[in-house]
């Protein structure tokens, strides 16, 4: 079966996201006919069964259903229960995303956020920064020469009081700047700056970068009070605390650490008829095991820091 799902197809300019189909207008402009393109399915729809010869090789029956599935971030959102209206998930992987589900289609006219079809049958807004947990890996492994991230973070004491800023643009930046030439930098060091200050600045810089996308969503009238979190970086209790207070959001930690894989399995379960829809299976399977609450005093400190952070990129942009 030659097919794709709506969440992955949303990344192509040939796709009409609002109507969840190939755009006739864009196809005509590009000289493409729709029969050249993959069939479009909802992420939870059954598209066929495993081929007989492959099923035999794998020791399966020839009636194993195959669902369309979803792109990585959409699948992660399903796996963290970020479905329905007004739910949020932050992913701290190599790159970082803030993913907000919505029952209505909306567009940021400044193109700071992506507007895509979601795997749950609705839509989502997404901000994506190109370097998130990869900033922490680069700092620890390439610069400090260690893989003991926890030991480096153990020396961080005074949250919200660090005088060092870090711009997390190691590979340019997507949301919200859309600038391939943006570059990372540390700003504000002095003779008093410590190794822990620099490590803290990296964690905070990524959190500030994600908040840039959250602020765009807020400017569109979207109000979020809490978020799920996933990805390798989310295993750090300190980073979770920083994000909760930089964003002023409750941060929910879920039981499963395999958001995208779990999301794919959940979509398959809906496709096989085990559950009626994605929202139902998310309510059944996704379990919150911890919640990080923002602390008013720390939120106030980080608010002041963030307002300074957001002036840095426009100021240094001409240097890149």
Outline where the language-model segments fall.
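Active-site core segments that coordinate phosphate-bearing ligands/cofactors
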Residues: 1-4, 9-30, 52-320
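Active-site-proximal helix-loop elements at catalytic-domain edges
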Residues: 35-40
């Amino acid at each position: 079966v030659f097919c794709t799902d709506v969440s992955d197809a949303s990344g192509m300019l040939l796709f009409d996201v609002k109507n969840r189909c190939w755009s006739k207008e864009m196809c005509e402009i590009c000289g493409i006919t729709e029969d050249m393109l993959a069939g479009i399915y909802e992420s939870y729809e059954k598209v066929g069964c495993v081929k007989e010869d492959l099923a035999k090789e794998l020791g399966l029956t020839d009636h194993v259903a195959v669902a369309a599935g979803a792109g990585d971030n959409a699948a992660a959102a399903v796996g963290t229960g970020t479905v329905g209206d007004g739910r949020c998930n932050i992913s701290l992987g190599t790159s970082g995303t803030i993913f907000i589900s919505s029952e209505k289609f909306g567009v940021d006219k400044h193109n700071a956020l992506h507007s895509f079809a979601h795997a749950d049958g609705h839509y989502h807004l997404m901000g994506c920064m190109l370097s998130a947990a990869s900033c922490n890996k680069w700092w620890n492994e390439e610069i400090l020469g260690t893989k003991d991230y926890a030991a480096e973070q153990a020396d961080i004491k005074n949250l919200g009081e660090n005088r060092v800023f870090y711009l997390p643009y190691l590979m340019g930046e997507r949301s919200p700047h859309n600038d391939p030439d943006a570059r990372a930098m540390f700003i504000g060091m002095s003779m008093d700056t410590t190794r822990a200050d620099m490590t803290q600045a990296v964690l905070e810089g990524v959190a500030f970068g994600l908040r840039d996308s959250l602020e765009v969503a807020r400017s569109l009238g979207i109000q979020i009070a809490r978020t799920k979190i996933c990805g390798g970086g989310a295993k750090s209790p300190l980073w979770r605390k920083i994000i909760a207070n930089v964003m002023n959001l409750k941060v929910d930690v879920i039981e499963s650490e395999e958001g995208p894989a779990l999301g794919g399995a959940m979509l398959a379960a809906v496709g096989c008829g085990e559950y009626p829809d994605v929202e139902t299976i998310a309510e059944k399977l996704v379990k919150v095991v911890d919640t990080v609450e923002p602390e008013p005093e720390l939120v106030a400190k980080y608010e002041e820091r963030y307002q300074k952070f957001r002036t840095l990129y426009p100021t240094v942009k001409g240097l890149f």
